[in-house]
Amino acid sequence: GDVYKRQICIGVGNEGEGRTHYSGQLISGNVLDAELAIGDYEPQISIQIWKRAMDNARIELIAPTGERLVISDRNAGVVHHNIKNMRIVSKAYGPGPFYMGEEIYAAMVATSGYITSGIWEIRFTVENVLDGFFNMWLPPVSTLSSATGFLRPSPEYTFTIPGTSRRAICVGANGRAPGSAATFSGRGVNVKSGLMLYAKPDITAVSYTHLTLPTTY
C-alpha cells in the first residue's frame, strides 16, 4: 500500500464455530489431553499441531478402543501405524532459518470403510518447555462431518490463509447485534498468544440482512 497505493483485502473464512481449532499451553512435567470427536463416515482426516521447536513433548493418539500410538517423539522421524482398517502416518517439520516453530502433521486414512468413530485423545506428555503455547487444526469444517471436531475448541486462530498475511487487510463479519461478530466468522487474536504477535481481523463488514446488486441488468 505504501508503494503502489493499493491494498489487498482478504476474508477471514467461516471456521469460527467449526470446532476445527484447539489452543493450549503445555507445562513442564505435566500431561495434557485434548479430546477429538470423530463422527461416522469419515474416510480420512488430518491433524496439524504447531508448537515451539524447543518445547519437548511426547505426543500420542489414543483410539476409542484404547490403542496408544506415538505420533511424535524427540527422535521419531516419520512414524507409521496400522490398526484395524486404518493407516496413520505422521511427520515433524521444522524449525527453519526464519521460523522457530515446529509442525507435526498426522494423517489418519481408512484402508477400507471409514475411520473408527468416537472420542479420540491427543496426549502430550511434557518434558520441558519455554512458553508451552501450541495450536492444533483440523481440515476445513466444510469437509468434515458435523459430529467431528474438538470437544473444547478455541475460536481464536480460525482465520484462514491467505488472511494470515501481516500486510493484507483481513476482513471479518459483523453479527446481527450492533458491535458483535458473526459466530461463523474466522478470528485471529488481540493479545500475544502462542506464535502470533499481531491482531486479526483488521476490520469487519456487514454479513446479515444486506442488499446486493443483481448479476444482470
What are the roles of these predicted feature ranges?
Residues G1-Y4, H210-Y217:
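Single conserved hydrophobic/aromatic residue that forms the stacking wall/gate
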Residues L61, N135-L138:
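Short, surface-exposed beta-strand/strand-loop-strand elements in extracellular ectodomains
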Residues V126-N135:
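Short acidic/polar inter-strand loop motif in beta-rich domains
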Residues R123-T125, P139-T143:
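Glycine-rich, aromatic-lined ligand/substrate-binding cores of catalytic
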Residues V141-P155:
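Low-complexity, Pro/Ser/Thr- and charge-rich linker/hinge segments at domain boundaries
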Residues Q7, G18-A107, S112-T116, F124-T125, ...:
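Extracellular S/T/G-rich loop segment that most often corresponds to the catalytic His/Ser-adjacent loop
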Residues G13:
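Active-site glycine-centered loops adjacent to acidic/histidine catalytic or metal-binding residues
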